[in-house]
Amino acid sequence: MMQESVTETISNSSMNQNGMSTLSSQLDAGSRDGRSSGDTSSEVSTVELLHLQQQQALQAARQLLLQQQTSGLKSPKSSDKQRPLQVPVSVAMMTPQVITPQQMQQILQQQVLSPQQLQALLQQQQAVMLQQQQLQEFYKKQQEQLHLQLLQQQQQQQQQQQQQQQQQQQQQQQQQQQQQQQQQQQQQQQHPGKQAKEQQQQQQQQQLAAQQLVFQQQLLQMQQLQQQQHLLSLQRQGLISIPPGQAALPVQSLPQAGLSPAEIQQLWKEVTGVHSMEDNGIKHGGLDLTTNNSSSTTSSTTSKASPPITHHSIVNGQSSVLNARRDSSSHEETGASHTLYGHGVCKWPGCESICEDFGQFLKHLNNEHALDDRSTAQCRVQMQVVQQLEIQLSKERERLQAMMTHLHMRPSEPKPSPKPLNLVSSVTMSKNMLETSPQSLPQTPTTPTAPVTPITQGPSVITPASVPNVGAIRRRHSDKYNIPMSSEIAPNYEFYKNADVRPPFTYATLIRQAIMESSDRQLTLNEIYSWFTRTFAYFRRNAATWKNAVRHNLSLHKCFVRVENVKGAVWTVDEVEYQKRRSQKITGSPTLVKNIPTSLGYGAALNASLQAALAESSLPLLSNPGLINNASSGLLQAVHEDLNGSLDHIDSNGNSSPGCSPQPHIHSIHVKEEPVIAEDEDCPMSLVTTANHSPELEDDREIEEEPLSEDLE
């Protein structure tokens, strides 16, 4: 039992490996061998001790096995005596290194090892454990270092590979560039004539442009020759008289004769814009009615390529317009005969390049506007613009036809006149008017007017039978145009607010309207100014002039009353005085037509055309009183109704804007037949417009015309 307990204790205990060599060599002396093992532990290293322990354990195990085989027949006593010495030592060398407290107590009770030996074993065991920990840490550090080295090597290899790839890519790109350059060189060598072909194409384009220019110049020369021939033919017929200082008349009054409507539309589209019916009227009747229907729509386009105008006389009060057109057209036709060149600027759409002379313009035209895609596209755009303008012109012509139909006036057909007549239109001004009213309005390019064709033969006077029931006619037109101003402004509020168009009313009417629109029917001067600028875009400029006109009207008109109140000085309207002043203008005695303003509105232009129709239709018959019949009398009556209506609603200050409705302030002016003493020897008998006004009406006219002149200055 003692041997078995010692064997189990040793097998479960841990002994120091440094002292195992002495125990295995001396099995019989346990205590002495333990001491000697403590002495040798300091001399032998840990690694050597481990090897020795393993070898000794193996040897002890072998010896134990051999002894068990040889002593199997011996008595149990002898085997019991030997086992305590051999088995525990061999088993102890193979046991783990940790000794539990229970195992320690068993060893102490059995007295196999002394306490000193056990302490020495424990110390050795701790030293061995520390050494093992140090070895493990050392191994870990070495492994980490090796791992880091491996990672660094891998990174270096990757970087090297990337650098190699980049170098390869650069080399490939260089090779591709070299190949492309080589291909380009080869292509240039294979096709040396491409540049020459391009140069030839450019030269061909320049030649085509030069040919087109020559063709256009030839067309212009042909046009000039045809115009001169037409002028000579008219002069021979006695229809016109050209003084020595005058070379030509405006193209608007002398359309081309001998050309078909298609040729006129193609060659003179920007010059005349006149209907073929009107051309026939010129050739047969000897009267100029061309601009009656076209002035309102084509007045802004006729100044582009008109022939030279060298005379300085006033025609229809349009001296300023004719001077401006003469300057622009003479520059185009004389020094530089090209439609696309004027005032030193290229008129190609969107170009406007400055050219000092005509030669530089030709170079610019051949270089910049050659036959290419851009120029072709610009030509197409210009064609579309022309088409749109033609469509608009046709619409306006249809509108004019409908208006004339509504006014019970069919278009007049031209009739041949054996004796040309001298008709001075109601739109023209007499010499006395030019002398007495230096502040007459200059004619603007967009203002439609009726032209005059001077004719030197044949007296003609309107007979009394042609103008019946003048009083009834006057009353009807007075009622027709006696409409409030608010009904005119209300539907056209946005138009007057945004368009730079002067309203067709006098300053007095506008001031009254401003005051009547206010809540308490009274306004200060600044509030009146604000109403003018807020309601009409026309009064947002030239404030100094029209404000002076407003103050002038406020101070001179009796219908405006100045009242002092809490707000200060305010202005009110005396409706009784205003209506009294209005009735004085409406109910005037029938007088001769005189002093008709030169600037007419759209309705006045229409009535001017009706007057021309009157002259063409009725006056040839009036030259022979026996040919007058009831039809001609009715026609004259209708014409005079429209004439008196147009004269009644003209603005008393002589100003009216195109496209505006009739005006509430009117002068009662009527046509009266009366032979007038001729002022020129060449005109023995003619229709000259004169007028008589009462002193009160003259005062009102002076009041309204003076601020208007200030406005235009």
Curated annotation (Swiss-Prot):
Residues 1-44, 279-337, 436-463, 647-666, 676-713 are annotated as: Disordered. It is found in: Nucleus. This is Forkhead box protein P2. It comes from Pongo pygmaeus. Residues 386-407 are annotated as: Leucine-zipper. InterPro entries: FH_FOXP1_P2, Fork_head_dom, FOXP, FOXP-CC, TF_fork_head_CS_2, WH-like_DNA-bd_sf, WH_DNA-bd_sf. Gene3D superfamilies: 1.20.5.340, Winged helix-like DNA-binding domain superfamily/Winged helix DNA-binding domain. It holds the Pfam family Forkhead. Transcriptional repressor that may play a role in the specification and differentiation of lung epithelium. May also play a role in developing neural, gastrointestinal and cardiovascular tissues. Can act with CTBP1 to synergistically repress transcription but CTPBP1 is not essential. Plays a role in synapse formation by regulating SRPX2 levels. The leucine-zipper is required for dimerization and transcriptional repression. GO terms for biological process: caudate nucleus development; putamen development. Residues 697-713 have a biased composition (Acidic residues). Residues 290-303, 436-457 have a biased composition (Low complexity). Forms homodimers and heterodimers with FOXP1 and FOXP4. Dimerization is required for DNA-binding. Interacts with CTBP1. Interacts with FOXP1. Interacts with TBR1. Interacts with ZMYM2. One of its GO terms (molecular function) is protein homodimerization activity. The lineage of its organism: Eukaryota, Metazoa, Chordata, Craniata, Vertebrata. The keyword Zinc-finger applies. Residues 324-335 have a biased composition (Basic and acidic residues).
